[in-house]
Amino acid sequence: MRSLCRLLRASVLIAAVGCHVHQVAPLDPERLSQEEMLQEHFTNVYDAVASLRSGWLTVRGTDSFKQTSQIWVYYDENRLGSVDEMRSVLVNSVASLRHYDGVDATMRWGVGHSAGAIQILSHK
């Protein structure tokens, strides 16, 4: 009888743990795939980033005492503009996105990137 109670408790515990739903962290917090964006039914890239990787839109660092820093957006290797430009880029037209912090963005694209950059990668 005692072993039957233990077995019943173990079964209930396993069932409860197995049914627990939890959020899974993104595989790479510096990348965002088209699949992730489409899975959540986003149509434009800005809304996807604002919802799934909101930290990418937070300005950190300054370029000078007079001007506030800006996060730059690149489409492949071409500067698109500010993050607002992502509103016009459709999720279906991109393969993935990559975030660069200020140091990495400055190393890649030069001075004026202390706030970082977001690179939109097309289907090549």
What does each of the following model-derived ranges do?
Residues 94-124:
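A beta-strand signature from Gram-negative outer-membrane beta-barrel systems
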Residues 39-64:
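Post-signal-peptide N-terminal segment of Sec-exported extracytoplasmic proteins
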Residues 55-59, 80-82, 103-108:
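Short beta-strands and strand-coil junctions in structured, solvent-facing domains, enriched
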Residues 27-46, 72-80, 122:
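Short, polar/charged loop or turn motifs at beta-strand boundaries
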Residues 1-19:
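Sec-dependent bacterial lipoprotein signal peptides
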